[in-house]
Structure formats: C-alpha cells, structure tokens
Amino acid sequence: MEILMAVLAGIIFMAATYLLLSKSLLRVIIGTALLSHGVHLMLLTMGGLKKGAAPILSEHAKSFVDPLPQALILTAIVISFGVTSFILVMAFRAYQELKSDDMDQMRGNDQHE
C-alpha cells in the first residue's frame, strides 16, 4: 500500500510541476495547491499506514497508531487552505486591475531601456 501511495504522490508532484510552469496565474495557483496535497500524501505515507486503535488508554486495544503524522497533516492542510485562499484573492485583485491572468503581461514594461 505504501508503494501505491508513493507512486500517487509522484504523479501529483508531476502534475503540480506542469501547472507551476505554465503562464496562467490560475494554473500556477492550482499547481501550488496540488503540490501541497502531494506533500500531505507523502507525509501520510512516511508516517506509516498501519491498522490499529486510537491512542486512547483502554484494555482491549493491543496496538496503537501514532497520532503525530495525522496532527501534522491536519495542521498543514489548514495552513495551505489559508495561503491558497489569500493567493486567490490577490490573483483576483490583479485580474481586476490588469484584465489578464497571463504572467508575461503582468510583468509590465522595463523602464531601464
């Protein structure tokens, strides 16, 4: 199962890299979100995919699952959601001002020529 998750994380990284290298600002933002999801999947895989009970003291559970990777990923998901929403608002504002989401048109003119 870990191999399948690692391959899936690699595919997500490839798609994110493709989107990050495009000229459209919206594609770059989607690529950034995909990259963060790939990192979340990689962290989950590195934490180990084990079956077990919740880490609550009880007499019936014999093996426990480590809660640290899940807590780390949950925190990273919340942070990436906040950053993505902030970047989307900034991109919308730039689109309102410039009437384009093309990265080459957003650069402006070079005044040193």
From Swiss-Prot:
Keyword Transmembrane: yes
GO terms of biological process kind: sodium ion transmembrane transport
Ion transport keyword on record: yes
Disulfide bond residue pairs: none
Intracellular or extracellular location(s): Cell membrane
Pfam families listed in its UniProt record: Oxidored_q2
Any one of the GO CC terms: plasma membrane
Chief localization: membrane
Alphabetized GO MF terms: sodium:proton antiporter activity
Topology versus the membrane: Multi-pass membrane protein
Domain of life: Bacteria
Spans traversing the lipid bilayer: 4-21, 28-47, 67-89
Keywords on record: Antiport, Cell membrane, Hydrogen ion transport, Ion transport, Membrane, Sodium, Sodium transport, Transmembrane, Transmembrane helix, Transport
Note: Mrp-dependent antiport apparently occurs by a secondary, proton motive force-dependent mechanism, but the similarity of several Mrp proteins to membrane-embedded subunits of energy-coupled NADH dehydrogenase complexes raises the possibility that there is a capacity for electron transport that could provide a primary energy coupling option for Mrp functions.
Family membership: Belongs to the CPA3 antiporters (TC 2.A.63) subunit C family.
Annotated NCBIfam families: PRK08600.1 (NF006372), PRK12660.1 (NF009303)
Job description of the protein: Mrp complex is a Na(+)/H(+) antiporter that is considered to be the major Na(+) excretion system in B.subtilis. Has a major role in Na(+) resistance and a minor role in Na(+)- and K(+)-dependent pH homeostasis as compared to TetB. MrpA may be the actual Na(+)/H(+) antiporter, although the six other Mrp proteins are all required for Na(+)/H(+) antiport activity and Na(+) resistance. MrpA is required for initiation of sporulation when external Na(+) concentration increases. Also transports Li(+) but not K(+), Ca(2+) or Mg(2+).
Protein name according to UniProt: Na(+)/H(+) antiporter subunit C
Naturally occurring in which organism (per UniProt): Bacillus subtilis (strain 168)
